[in-house]
Amino acid sequence: MSVSLFTAFTVLSLCLHTSTSEFQLSTISAAPSFLPEAPSSFSASTPAMSPDTSPLFPTPGSSEMSPSPSESSIMPTIPSSLSPPNPDAVTPDPLLEVSPVGSPLPASSSVCLVSSQLSSLLLVLLMLLLAFCSFF
């Protein structure tokens, strides 16, 4: 069985090698073969736009873009109010910093629930139990 698998993989690799060697890959250059000249009608300055297509930008002294009183009553206004306080910047509640017993909470949040001696004893007992079960 292993000889037939080896033969199949060998034949397959030879077929793939001969089929890929027949292809010739061509490369495409990103640079154009020639650079076209700029049209003679192109000028350095931008052409002036007609008044109907030119954008209307507000100027500091003009009131053309300000809405009329009838439009301003239709447009909703956003009330300026203070944003809510940052919860990180708010001083913490002193009652929450004390544990139920009354002593302050430890600096780290990890608390060892089982002592190292007890955990090593449990580990030894577990290994003995596994060894005992493997005999039966």
Swiss-Prot record:
Q: Where in the cell is it found?
A: Cell membrane
Domain of life, source organism: Eukaryota
**Lipidated residue numbers (GPI-anchor amidated serine):** S108
The record's annotation in InterPro entries points to: AGP25/26
Q: Bias category Polar residues: which stretches?
A: 40-53
What keywords would UniProt list here?
Cell membrane, Glycoprotein, GPI-anchor, Lipoprotein, Membrane, Proteoglycan, Signal
| Compositional bias ranges of the Low complexity kind | 59-81
Map out region (Disordered) in residue numbers: 38-95
Q: Give the signal peptide range.
A: 1-21
The job of this chain, per UniProt, is described as: Proteoglycan that seems to be implicated in diverse developmental roles such as differentiation, cell-cell recognition, embryogenesis and programmed cell death.
> What is the protein's name according to its record?
Classical arabinogalactan protein 26
Q: Which organism is it from?
A: Arabidopsis thaliana (Mouse-ear cress)
